[in-house]
Amino acid sequence: MQKLLNFVIVTICIIFINCSNSSTNPNANIVRDLTTAEIKLTESDNKFGLKLFKEIVNSEENKNIFISPLSISMALGMTYNGADSTTLEAMHETLEYGDLTTQEVNESYQSLIKLLTELDPKVIFDIANSIWYREGFSVENDFIGLNTTYFDAVVRALDFNADSAADIINEWVSEKTNGKIEEIVDKPIDPLTVMFLINAIYFKGTWTYEFDEENTTDDIFYLPDGSETQCKMMSHKNDHNYFENEQFQAIDLPYGDAGFSMTIFLPKPGIDIDSLIAQFSNDSWNSWISSFSSQEVNLYLPKFKMEYEKSLNDVLCTLGMSIAFDPYQADFTKINSDGNLYISNVKHKTFVKVNEEETEAAAVTSVEITLTSVGETGITMCINHPFIFVIRENHSGTILFIGKIVEPEWED
């Protein structure tokens, strides 16, 4: 019988500004300060990403989850440029844009994409955007112009009636994720679908302090129901940024020149992982991160690898965007002035692999637009029970991934 996947990895790609020492590594690259608008956008994306994370965890208890809110935010950010009236207002509120203007949102995404992808020469972090629309469907020039200028989006018309259309889009997705995600559009394309807005993200970072494969052993991982499973447990002893309180231990594991890192939250015995996740907010996150300090840690971390897929329609409706999914109320007249358009599906797929040498992760988000139908010594941290992990960029405070693991799996 196939073993039940019983852990959750949620990858949040949100952007926010750290209030304190996001990295104490002296080798970290020195980069420019964020603008006021960029700071506001990072804070907005942080709020959106954390509430999205918590909503998905609430809806998928004890399941493997892995999402990229940065990918989701960017795909919806492009779509936002086509919204108007109450649909625009609902998306603005759901995405937590606050007092940011559309121009400020666009300009900040443009500059942050450049900053994030050029930050650390020892880490591969790529962001790609594209818009694919049905041949013969009229698209407003302003909509295309905004997304090509600020999101560097590739824009192309295709014959959606041909099977080759889905193949072309999926080939682009596979290329931009280094083959880790091969398909986002299914065949045949719905005859009423007129557009796909797609974001793809790829991350590959080598640990600053790699794990020795010779130290990896078969070990026990404790599941939420109290049962046990086997895992491949890596280990090493190093100085790391570390913090603990009454509820959890936390450690920060840098990649490359420490421009990016994975932050892991391990609930202490008796603390439910979902109750800890419920406490995640801008304030709590900033408070926790500012409390880290360098300490010698005996670390035990399981290897894991997984893929994940989810339609985000229900979650986004719960968070306040339901009008955008309503065929008769949605207003996307900035995409096409005739209107009669709505979001029929927001599809999200991800991949992650963590081993002794590196972390590799990828995410794709597709927003489908459809026509309305007329019808040892020192500290020891042994991660052998459910834990939370976050991969982040340390200058802007971008959370690239945030995960909840209740059962790590590894297959060679």
Residue ranges and their predicted role:
Residues 63-64, 194-195, 261, 388, ...:
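Beta-sheet entry/capping signal
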